[in-house]
Amino acid sequence: MSLSNWPLKKENSEAYNIKNSKQITIPDGLWIKCFDCGLLMYSKVLKRNLKVCPQCSYHFQASSNERIDQLIDQGSWQPMDVHLISTDPLGFKDQKLYSQRLKDTAFKTGLQDAVQTGTGTMQGKKVCLGIMDFRFMGGSMGSVVGEKLTRLLEKATQEKLPAIILCASGGARMQEGMLSLMQMAKISSALEMHKKENLLYISVLTSPTTGGVTASFAMLGDLIIAEPKALIAFAGRRVIEQTIKEDLPDNFQSSEYLFEHGFLDLIVSRTQLRSKLIQILSLHNHSK
């Protein structure tokens, strides 16, 4: 007798019927796949490792809130200028009104703009800290970002505190035109006043750090630190290749390439960043 004619009990046939089997629903975000090595891991494992792949050390993007938790002593964070909100001086519109885009992004991220600033302690040492957030319009630098960072640096100068800025940005915000470009000079001027008081400024470059941010305060640190394999650039790779009519190296605009050519002082993994910053702050205080 052929298998097709083999008698099956009704209850057995129903037990092996896929349609009748109980389906298991897996919650969204439970698993995360590494973009670099392809490792599939629990999201909790990635979070516990500060969003660094435990297999290949690929650095996932981290939010400004996550950065604060990773770097600052618990309970010591004092935010600054949380009330500042961008306006729409040009009445700019692309696919939607800039004013509406600001509202939508604020609702989605819970942020007022692309940077959080404030003071806190790192192993008891008080610092002024600015953390850019790429989730808010690509971390673009508009008038509010520039004003908040300038006020942060002025406070650091007034209170004789070291300043640390973590950069993550696509550059100047085109929706604000010249108002965004002038922030480059404004922040740089505040840094010069901070420097004249012989105070420490540490710039930490994360992926990506590009455009007007790279062309100003990101590269003005007394110490310039970058995360591994971070994209750090001014113009885009294709723009440069089309301009100079040459092919660029594969690792061009990576933190490793910049370190090799003397643009960076250190490349530090996110898992070691807090301890390295504390070490630098201790050495700076000891040298006074």
UniProtKB/Swiss-Prot annotation:
It is found in: Plastid, Chloroplast stroma. GO terms for biological process: fatty acid biosynthetic process; malonyl-CoA biosynthetic process. Zn(2+) binds at residues 34, 37, 53, 56. Its cofactor is Zn(2+). Binds 1 zinc ion per subunit. Pfam families: Carboxyl_trans, Zn_ribbon_ACC. Keywords: ATP-binding, Chloroplast, Fatty acid biosynthesis, Fatty acid metabolism, Lipid biosynthesis, Lipid metabolism, Metal-binding, Nucleotide-binding, Plastid, Transferase, Zinc, Zinc-finger. It is an enzyme of class 2 (transferase). Residues 30-288 form the CoA carboxyltransferase N-terminal domain. PROSITE patterns: COA_CT_NTER (PS50980). Its EC number is 2.1.3.15. It comes from the Eukaryota. Coiled coil: none annotated. One of its GO terms (molecular function) is ATP binding. GO terms for cellular component: acetyl-CoA carboxylase complex; chloroplast stroma. It catalyses: N(6)-carboxybiotinyl-L-lysyl-[protein] + acetyl-CoA = N(6)-biotinyl-L-lysyl-[protein] + malonyl-CoA. Signal peptide: none annotated. Belongs to the AccD/PCCB family. Component of the acetyl coenzyme A carboxylase (ACC) complex. Biotin carboxylase (BC) catalyzes the carboxylation of biotin on its carrier protein (BCCP) and then the CO(2) group is transferred by the transcarboxylase to acetyl-CoA to form malonyl-CoA. This is Acetyl-coenzyme A carboxylase carboxyl transferase subunit beta, chloroplastic. It comes from Pyropia yezoensis.
